[in-house]
Amino acid sequence: MPQVRNPILPGFNPDPSILRVGEDYYIATSTFEWYPGVQIHHSRDLANWELVARPLNRKSQLDMRGNPDSCGIWAPCLSHDGERFWLVYTDVKRKDGSFKDTPNYIVTAEKIEGPWSDPIYINSSGFDPSLFHDDDGRKWFVNMLWDHRRRPQLFEGIVLQEFDPKAGKLVGPRKNIFTGTDLALVEGPHLYKRNGWYYLLTAEGGTGYEHACTFARSRNIWGPYEVHPQKYILTSKDHPHAALQRAGHGDIVDTPDGRTYLVHLTGRPTTQFRRCVLGRETAIQEAYWGDDDWLYVKNGPVPSLWVDLPAARDDTKYWEEKRYTFESGLHKDFQWLRTPETDRIFRTREDGKLTLIGRESIGSWFEQALVARRQTHFSCDAETVIDFSPEDQRQFAGLTAYYCRYNFFYLAVSAHSDGQRELFIMASEASWPLGELRYPVPEGVRIPNEGKVRLALTIRGRELQFYYALEGEELKKIGPVLDASIVSDECGGHQKHGSFTGAFVGVAASDLNGTAAEATFDYFIYRPVQHPSDRYEI
């Protein structure tokens, strides 16, 4: 079989849940504060994937205004019971401190493209929910159980309860069926059944560099569950030089010809600081069932960079330059932050342009006008042309490399207090918890009050450089070289386990006067670049 290099979903695509229906494979991944919620990719061969749905796309399903960074949609589980698709997920409202507010929901659809139902509320006892359809027709709901008292630990275990689809609620007894191993932080549960065994796959160790997939089984769904003889069937925690780090939070799928694969999240750190700019990505491993009825990862437990898959991957689209215009609406590569009310933050135009409506400051947890796409390459270029006439320094719009409020670079068109237009750079560099900005060009660069401005950035590994050009002129540098590796999980806030998204590049607009000043963008270009600084393997 052809060998394919991991990851199969590059860029911010964590917590994969995989499903096969007939000849079709689907992977659902977390989207956190980015709207619409949940990404679902489709493949016929496990190698070539296409984004086909974002199910949580209207106000009656999802409104994340006020959700802090790295809250929102955590760890969706996608399943099919022979009649319809089921999607369970958490909409996290708070993650800091001892408490976590974690309402869990279910939506359903007959077709993967939708329409998806309005959500049914299930519980709030923890996160990472999963739905298991047993062969007797019963449905079982599992999630990790959170204990704010730490008696003995925050991650208390995996709780099981039956779900009644007719009543739309959990019924019957509830039990903590698995408390994990000494690695702790047990989460991400998925149940399976094979040869009379119930199998429980979980994640442990947190989503950083101690991450692992733990496997256990029982003859009874209620337990007790015995742990796999290897304990962790997938992990890179003891191999710091493996190309794929942070391996964990997996799910299992069988092919029609009987092969077994495990998908999992991974991170590819760059620089000596081990920073995952592209966030947590989705990788795949070949697995097999042993004579002892245990699952093993081929060449495991360390994840393989290259994996045998049923087909070769066509990387043509991955490396092609994307020039986006907006006459047909927002391209599916783009998302925005938190709000279902898009008419308040942007509109697409028949002439192909995109207009952003200035709202709150960049980094706001409520209503900011920011439209961006994932950075899916270690090195890339981004470019746009902006038409914007700000009145003062409280109105600004432009081009950004963005992770969260504590973690972004922003080249913006604004105005001095006397109304003269200027360009300036805002840098929020690992600024948690205060969120203070630095201005690499303290006095700004004054520009004419009339005319469009071309804005661009280049990223070459850890080096980010902004550029600008007035109409009829060539691009010129503005500001110093900035540290692009800052726009990463490791610098997004809580540096070990608390930042969960990935780097985006896009456009933004703010009007702190509250007058909804508009900025128009002619196009957006994303250009992948192959550069010697890119480290795909060590």
UniProtKB/Swiss-Prot annotation:
Pfam families according to UniProt: GH43_C2, Glyco_hydro_43
Q: Does the keyword Oxidoreductase apply?
A: no
**UniProt keyword list:** Glycosidase, Hydrolase
The record's GO molecular-function terms, alphabetically, read: xylan 1,4-beta-xylosidase activity
Q: Which gene encodes it?
A: Xyl43B
Q: What is this protein called?
A: Xylosidase/arabinosidase 43B
Question: What does the UniProt function comment say about this protein?
Answer: Bifunctional beta-xylosidase/alpha-L-arabinosidases with a low level of xylanase activity. Is most active on 4-nitrophenyl beta-D-xylopyranoside (pNPX) (defined as 100%), moderate on p-nitrophenyl-alpha-L-arabinofuranoside (pNPA) (56.6%), and weak on beechwood xylan (5.7%) and birchwood xylan (2.7%). Is able to attack xylooligosacchardies with degrees of polymerisation of 2-5, releasing the amounts of reducing sugars in the order of xylopentose > xylotetraose > xylotriose > xylobiose, i.e. the rate of xylose released from xylooligosacchardies increased with the chain length.
Signal peptide (UniProt feature, chain positions): none
* Temperature dependence of activity: Optimum temperature is 50 degrees Celsius.
